[in-house]
């Protein structure tokens, strides 16, 4: 759910994507499973099915890009160990888009026109997926992407685009908003402050929270958009402290913004009753080390994936990931694996890779069970579910909502004081 920065180059990139040269099953109701495992014990044979993707393996966004690569490659390995896709081995061709919009457009054009891939998987972030998905749409190829929840992804009338997480950016914090709205009057915040990144993903998260909390009766006392190059949040923290809001919500796209705002709030000595941050707290130890372990307690954030989630295939995925990489999967790795599961489910249901429209039509009409849970999509390719609501508690990351997925019965409220 960590998404990247908006650049002014996007109109040019979209123009390049949309002028690129074009290349050249029955629906079934119910939930299909993209398991990462085909017909167990069956040897894949024949010409490989080539799946193309470009990821930010270098540049500013290399950390989530490398994690996504791990997810894709684990899925490929498991599929090939268990009979392949439609009985054929899978070959994933991954290019490095260098965290650059122009490069990602060139990469997907090359994958389609030169590498002659049969299928596509998406890149990381709304920033890169907006132009990349335009290349896929122009070429009438299914485009399942693991990390691009900006509203701008879904307002273009695309038929082949699908986002393989639970919800789009404006709805990332729906469970937080619902929880706040349901608090007793003596616990419910009266005033709110919103720190909004100028970013196609992070901005809509904070704006969605503000809209929801205002509808719940929370008065807005501070709401400002900050530029993506902001490093020092001291002035923002001081302005917020002067307004004394009960709840603070930040919408950003990565680790650094959230860490720096928290440090500044600690510095000015202002502690809200409730504190929600998009993206940053999900960076686990990097967030904890950045803000200080004692300053994580009570911080809310949204998650697409948690290692302890009781979702279909998650236990097997977790074990396989640890065995292959000797580490727990990052959220971005799980998101990429789930995107591949969605692609697999469509191909297996249709029984062919020759009709991309049939694959898209099947996904529009059906649900798919993944390690993130059951996913379904509206006519724009936007998902229709809800993210998990998580909270840092005593140095641990806990799922607090929904109740049937919670790893604890406790929600820390109000937030404990900062530890200087």
Show the residue positions of the predicted features:
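Bacterial N-terminal signal peptides that target proteins for export
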Residues: 1-10
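Extracytoplasmic ligand/sensor domains, especially the bilobed periplasmic-binding protein
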Residues: 117-223, 273-298
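C-terminal motif of bacterial Sec signal peptides marking the signal peptidase cleavage site
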Residues: 18-22
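Signal peptide-proximal N-terminal region
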Residues: 49, 70-92, 182-187, 214-218
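Segments of small-molecule ligand-sensing domains
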Residues: 323-333, 344-400
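Extracytoplasmic "Venus flytrap"
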Residues: 38-73, 95-102, 124-125, 195-204, ...
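Beta-alpha junction/loop-to-helix N-cap segments that form part of ligand/metal-binding clefts
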Residues: 27-31, 35-40, 63-68, 83-155, ...
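Extracellular/periplasmic periplasmic-binding protein-like sensory domains
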Residues: 166, 262-337, 349, 403-419
């Amino acid at each position: 759910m960590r998404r990247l920065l908006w650049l002014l180059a996007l109109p040019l990139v979209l123009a390049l994507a949309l002028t690129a040269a074009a290349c050249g099953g029955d629906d079934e109701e119910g939930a299909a499973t993209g398991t990462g495992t085909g017909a167990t014990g069956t040897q894949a044979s024949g010409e490989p099915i080539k799946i193309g993707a470009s990821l930010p393996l270098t540049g500013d966004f290399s950390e989530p890009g490398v994690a996504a690569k791990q997810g894709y490659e684990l899925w490929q390995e498991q599929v090939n160990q268990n009979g392949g896709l439609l009985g054929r081995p899978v070959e994933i061709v991954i290019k490095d888009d260098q965290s650059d919009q122009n490069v990602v457009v060139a990469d997907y054009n090359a994958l389609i026109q030169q590498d002659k891939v049969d299928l596509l998987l998406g890149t990381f972030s709304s920033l890169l997926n907006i132009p990349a998905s335009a290349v896929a749409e122009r070429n009438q190829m299914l485009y399942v992407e693991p990390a691009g929840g900006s509203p701008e992804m879904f307002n273009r009338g695309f038929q082949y685009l699908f986002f393989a997480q639970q919800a789009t950016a404006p709805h990332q914090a729906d469970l937080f908003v619902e929880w706040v709205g349901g608090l007793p009057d003596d616990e419910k915040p009266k005033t709110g402050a919103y720190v909004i990144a100028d970013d196609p993903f992070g901005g809509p998260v904070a704006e969605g929270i503000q809209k929801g909390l205002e509808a719940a009766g929370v008065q807005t006392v501070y709401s400002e958009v900050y530029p993506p190059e902001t490093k020092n949040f001291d002035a923002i923290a001081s302005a917020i402290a002067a307004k004394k809001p009960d709840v603070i919500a930040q919408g950003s796209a990565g680790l650094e913004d959230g860490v720096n705002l928290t440090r500044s709030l600690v510095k000015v000595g202002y502690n809200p009753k409730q504190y929600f941050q998009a993206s940053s707290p999900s960076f686990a130890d990097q967030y904890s080390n950045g803000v200080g372990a004692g300053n994580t307690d009570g911080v809310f954030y949204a998650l697409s994936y948690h290692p302890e989630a009781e979702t279909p295939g998650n236990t097997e995925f977790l074990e396989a990931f640890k065995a292959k990489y000797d580490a727990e999967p990052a959220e971005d790795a799980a998101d990429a694996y789930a995107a591949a599961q969605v692609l697999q489910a469509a191909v297996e249901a249709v029984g062919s890779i020759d009709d991309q429209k049939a694959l898209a039509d099947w996904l529009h009409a059906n649900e798919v069970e993944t390690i993130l849970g059951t996913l379904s999509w509206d006519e724009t390719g936007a998902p229709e579910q809800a993210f998990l609501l998580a909270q840092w508690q005593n140095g641990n990351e806990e799922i607090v909502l929904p109740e049937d997925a919670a790893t604890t019965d406790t929600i820390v409220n109000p937030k404990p004081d900062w530890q200087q």
